[in-house]
């Protein structure tokens, strides 16, 4: 979902190249260890929106590095504002297209990829744009470590069913599946970090669908 344009966001993003990498050339290597200043494990959220999920995660886990992959400048600006306010040195913002994720990260370098409330692209002619389409799964497999995994959440039952089928057809294995995440066991609910959209949808009584899945290790 596109956010309303915030005029201040462009200047803020442009003023902080140390925190926001904008539209990098897919053919040029990104040195993440240099940008973070360490070689800690990396986790990526594809499509971070206003960034509540990824900034909370970064705050809770200073021992890890996080990348918010987000195309919209306004969203990047909102995330950056939170990052600066909280002093999250372990969070980088990447303004780029998710279709280039395998160009932005080297093979076998990422621990987790988060897909939270992605655009469902309900029309069949837009299937290839869904972030759980097989071509995207192939790219995630390239950048994830052999022991890495995907965590996916949505309120859209159609996208969830499609994603389960797509991942199953790709040969992935499911570690966790829920058709009502907010009514799971207390220990699962307590660990869940809500996104802005998730909070809104759950407040309306909508079930939240979730899964964790990994690729076959060779």
UniProtKB/Swiss-Prot annotation:
Catalytic activity: guanosine(46) in tRNA + S-adenosyl-L-methionine = N(7)-methylguanosine(46) in tRNA + S-adenosyl-L-homocysteine
UniProt keyword annotation of Manganese present: no
Residue ranges of the region described as Interaction with RNA: 125-130
Enzyme superclass (EC): transferase
A single GO molecular function term of this UniProt record: tRNA (guanine(46)-N7)-methyltransferase activity
UniProt: S-adenosyl-L-methionine binding residues: 45, 70, 97, 119
Top-level taxon of the source organism: Bacteria
E.C. number: 2.1.1.33
Annotated active site: 119
Claim: S-adenosyl-L-methionine is one of the keywords in the record: yes
Assigned keywords, A-Z: Methyltransferase, S-adenosyl-L-methionine, Transferase, tRNA processing
Annotated positions binding substrate: 123, 155, 195-198
Pathway: tRNA modification; N(7)-methylguanine-tRNA biosynthesis
Any GO CC annotation of this UniProt entry: tRNA methyltransferase complex
Matching InterPro entries: SAM-dependent_MTases_sf (IPR029063), tRNA_(Gua-N-7)_MeTrfase_Trmb (IPR003358), tRNA_methyltr_TrmB_bact (IPR055361)
Signal peptide: none
Family: Belongs to the class I-like SAM-binding methyltransferase superfamily. TrmB family.
Biological role stated in the UniProt entry: Catalyzes the formation of N(7)-methylguanine at position 46 (m7G46) in tRNA.
Name of the protein in its database record: tRNA (guanine-N(7)-)-methyltransferase
Organism expressing this protein natively: Lactobacillus acidophilus (strain ATCC 700396 / NCK56 / N2 / NCFM)
Lineage: Bacteria, Bacillati, Bacillota, Bacilli, Lactobacillales
Gene name in the database record: trmB
